[in-house]
């Protein structure tokens, strides 16, 4: 029976381990951007589910206490010393992690990135939660659908080096002129997936742009912070908050009207898929363009020319369904 226990790395870092039975033959590290984030906690549940299905797998769930590349580098060095079999990482910086991950691969450790990617030379494959262009369009559409006359919107992202959010924002910017000409993107700010900083950045946007109609936050931390700012500032009906959110964390803001709709994929499936992919690499399956990989009950993926694949399309949550999904994740 797998269970959670604490893995102490340093006084500045925290981690939890989902420990398999003593007979476990594979150690797979699920390295996240930061601990204490509901999205990654849900992914860890999926990782545990995959380990149970596969059998003989020990999942180490770990990450820094704040979303920094430096924190992840320290953790990866510790995992190399532990001689884990695979590292599956959601990165805080696509380039800064490459040297330490190359070191891991040189030691025979399999490396994949998921959610937030690592540069190709620092991993063997990458699993996107969804198609990048589709996510970019979705986050804009979530705002535009409730702005028939158009208007000013701003984006509150995670860190300025976050691979996934930067790609989604770039995709959003590209489709604005063609598909959403009435939407005016006035600013992009960064809350570093920290609730206090995200709150301050949201307040700054509202103060700096008095005609702001929507805040788009493609981060589960930032979207909650922005919705709380709108709620506390009596701005419901004036500023709509949308983006990517966990239904369980965000239901109250759909209910009170500070948000009309948000989207996300299933983070449980994402962590589950990361473990399945790592397990297959450990077993000798080669990551190369065109290669097909099973991700268990989630389905199958095919790697593209960059050894990347997407898991699923984003799903929209609004008043009609958020009650149901808030009970799941």
Where does each model-flagged region fall?
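Short terminal targeting/anchoring segments and short Lys/Arg-rich nucleic-acid-contact patches
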Residues: 1-3, 15
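A residue-level marker of the well-folded mature domains of exported/periplasmic proteins
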Residues: 3, 8, 23-329
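C-terminal segment of classical bacterial N-terminal signal peptides
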Residues: 13-23
